[in-house]
Amino acid sequence: MPSHYYLIIPASGVGVRMHPEKDGLNEQPKQYLKLDNGLTILDQTLKTLLSINQIKSCVIAIKNKDHLFAKSAFNNHPKLLTIVTGGKERMYSVLNALKALIDFAKDDDWVLVHDSVRPCVKASEIINLMKQLKHHATGGLLATKVVDTIKQADNNIINTTIDRSNLWQAQTPQMYRFSVLLKALNTAIKDGINITDETSAIEHLGLESILVKSSKSNIKVTNPEDLILANFYLNQHQK
């Protein structure tokens, strides 16, 4: 029986860097900011990913007392399996979403975890990720090669220049077998490992991840200027 593909969107962040003057606490979460096309960042993200035929269903993790997702155009989407409460950190949000899939996903089914604030990801690149990893035992992620010169510094004083020839910038989706990702996150939490993405948890287990080249346009909207760039890329995608 072929493996199914499930989508997890952790969307419980508050966006401190988007609203530094308010410490991100009293401003609208960045995933609900509007793009030039009239959609919120989250809705644009969902529009792209839920349009992919291979994706069977989706679990979204939102902040406790989040009343904004109820207004989403995708709140009643047929592929939306359930909504879970996000955790204090990303890994807990993803783990809560994985637990919601336990009664649905098989061990070797795929789970794609995608940042809610990466609205410019192309469906074609996600489909290529699925194709490249189809027969892999663990999984992998979209990424781009680092092209800038990278400096390591201490208190703004440069210590060294890092060889960039083998450096990649991790993006999302990050796609792993259901049972592997569930074990990886549980193990990382048990061991007290602070992870910032799913691949970090896989690395902690000592497992292999595959990098699949993506485009620079798959940006994460973190700062105000990123919103301008996201609108530019989305406009270019329509041409």
Swiss-Prot record:
Signal peptide: none
UniProtKB keywords: Isoprene biosynthesis, Nucleotidyltransferase, Transferase
Record site: Transition state stabilizer: 17, 30
Listed Pfam families: IspD (PF01128)
MF GO annotations: 2-C-methyl-D-erythritol 4-phosphate cytidylyltransferase activity
EC number: 2.7.7.60
Pathways per UniProt: Isoprenoid biosynthesis; isopentenyl diphosphate biosynthesis via DXP pathway; isopentenyl diphosphate from 1-deoxy-D-xylulose 5-phosphate: step 2/6
Function statement: Catalyzes the formation of 4-diphosphocytidyl-2-C-methyl-D-erythritol from CTP and 2-C-methyl-D-erythritol 4-phosphate (MEP).
UniProt name for this protein: 2-C-methyl-D-erythritol 4-phosphate cytidylyltransferase
Organism: Ruthia magnifica subsp. Calyptogena magnifica
Gene for this chain: ispD
